[in-house]
A protein has these predicted regions:
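Conserved pre-motif I regulatory segment
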Residues: 2-40
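Conserved helicase motor core of P-loop NTPases
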Residues: 6, 25, 29, 37-38, ...
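Conserved SAM-binding loop
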Residues: 18, 72, 268
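Short, conserved phosphate/pyrophosphate- and ester-handling motifs at nucleotide-, phospho-/glycolipid
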Residues: 22, 76, 272, 425
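ASCE P-loop NTPase helicase motor core
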Residues: 26-27, 31, 37-229
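Short beta-alpha junctions and helix-cap segments that line functional grooves
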Residues: 75, 311-314, 445-450
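Short, solvent-exposed amphipathic alpha-helical segments in soluble enzyme
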Residues: 88, 283-287, 448-452
């Protein structure tokens, strides 16, 4: 099938009248998918509500017509679950797909890039704004970074190409100013690829009554300005975005979100770990009535990658920073090595096929204001565990610490309230956002933070602690 016939087919299969930009996208993608050249990357950028998911579902459901296969990928388990839900097709995390874990004799894990055995396959990668081109975890990243490895993996396959999807108004990866996987110059210059791209910027007619999208689009437009001095929410004419000022109203809203939907379909997004800790404590005691330091039914977020507890054949492969778990059983809580640990049975909520398993939680990170154990704390734990194996050779000691279950305890925090970076790639039915402390006033970083937080909400958004002047009269 040539590109013009494929373009006609895409138009036919698309469930709506395409917007001007969507139509151009279909023309461009039809050429990209039918031409033989394998040195091109396609970047589809799009604001919230502009139909990225709908056009991509149409593509996925049409690839068979041109004898192409597809693989759906995302940076996190939660983001993979989102793309799987909207496309009704299986999706994987990038890590699970492209890396092969190797355990050394010492018990340490290192990851090797897998061989891409796919042929005639289009790799569709969602939430690409989260993909970094810097080396942040030396256990991974053969070529220096996740983006390097992803491009290297995909384009080493026979007739394989990649479509990167994302929204440049979202927060970039930690410590970066831009999202390199959506940056046309970075992709062209650093990876020696041709880059075809388009940005969808018209909100679809079906979404025009959404207050969440109306306000998100206003924020998105602000980012085009060179100077940003204020933003006012427009909540009056919308039912899906609500301002809360009274403590009792906040409690009622959280209660009803938990009972009408579920705890795991509700997120409370704040600016710092300190605020998240405070809200988690309040929510657990006042709303969920949990008095002990850990209870069955508690939801926690893992805050550091952990390669110890799962086998490669498990659905998740490893337990990643940002994965949410539910505590099903608590066997014991004890102090050891100067730290506190809980032996528990958990399920991973973003991996429905992952069988629940027993593990050890490191409790000290729950109240900590740092994102995970500090270097000093990790070192202290290492030295204490090492004492258990005195009298062994240095190498034996090292080997035994590496497989000690307490040394490998999952670092966790409660996940009722989380920071915005941790929420990225996820969607929740109900989202609460607290106005952060802004010592420098409103700036571009804050607008991106707010935009990212707001667009995590599918149906209802509550705004807490925002001043009167933050709203349209």
């Amino acid at each position: 099938m040539n590109s013009s016939s494929f373009y006609s087919l895409l138009q036919k299969k698309f469930p709506f009248q395409p917007t001007y930009k969507q139509d151009i996208f279909f023309q461009k993608i039809a050429i990209f998918l039918t031409e033989a050249d394998n040195n091109t990357i396609f970047v589809l950028k799009g604001y919230a509500g502009t139909g990225k998911t709908t056009v991509i579902s149409t593509i996925v459901n049409s690839l068979l017509d041109i004898n192409k296969k597809y693989v759906l990928l995302a940076p996190t388990g939660r983001a993979a679950k989102v793309i799987a839900n909207y496309s009704n097709k299986p999706a994987f995390t990038i890590h699970k797909k492209i890396y092969f874990p190797k355990k050394s004799s010492g018990g340490a894990v290192s990851f090797t890039l897998q061989q891409n055995k796919h042929t005639n396959t289009i790799f569709i990668v969602d939430e690409a704004s989260m993909i970094s081109d810097t080396n942040s975890d030396s256990k991974l990243y053969e070529n220096g970074s996740l983006l390097d490895d992803l491009i290297s993996y995909v384009y080493s396959g026979t007739n394989c190409k990649m479509i990167l999807l994302g929204d440049t108004a979202q927060l970039p990866p930690v410590n970066l100013d831009i999202s390199p996987a959506l940056d046309i110059r970075t992709l062209g210059m650093n990876y020696n690829k041709e880059v075809e791209h388009i940005e969808l910027d018209e909100v679809m007619r079906q979404e025009e009554n959404s207050g969440i999208l109306h306000n998100a689009t206003e924020l998105r437009e602000l980012l085009k300005d060179s100077f940003i001095d204020e933003f006012k929410f427009d909540v009056k004419k919308f039912k899906d975005i609500v301002r809360l000022t009274d403590g009792y109203d906040i409690q009622d809203a959280i209660n009803s979100a938990y009972s009408n939907y579920s705890i795991e379909d509700t997120a409370f997004i704040v600016r710092s770990n300190k605020r998240a800790n405070q809200y988690n404590e309040q929510i657990r005691t006042k709303i969920l009535g949990k008095e002990s330091e850990l209870s069955t039914g508690d939801f926690l977020m893992v805050v550091k990658n952990n390669y110890f507890w799962l086998k490669d054949s498990d659905e998740a492969g490893f337990i990643a920073n940002g994965d949410i778990i539910e505590v099903l059983e608590i066997f014991n809580i004890k102090e050891l090595y100067g730290f506190k640990f809980a032996k528990v049975k958990i399920r991973m909520i973003d991996y429905p096929n992952q069988i629940p398993f027993e593990t050890v939680l490191l409790m000290d990170t729950i109240k900590s204001e740092s994102p995970s154990l500090t270097y000093e704390e990790s070192n202290r734990l290492y030295q204490e565990v090492l004492k258990d194996y005195e009298g062994e050779t240095k190498f034996k000691q090292f080997q035994k610490v590496k497989v000690n279950e307490y040394f490998n305890g999952l670092q966790v925090k409660f996940s009722y309230a989380i920071t915005c970076h941790k929420s990225q790639g996820g969607q929740w039915n109900t989202v609460f956002i607290e106005q952060p402390y802004l010592p420098d006033g409103i700036n571009r970083d804050y607008i991106r933070w707010l935009y990212t937080a707001m667009t995590r909400a599918k149906n209802k958004l509550y705004l807490i602690g925002f001043k009167d002047e933050s709203f349209v009269e």
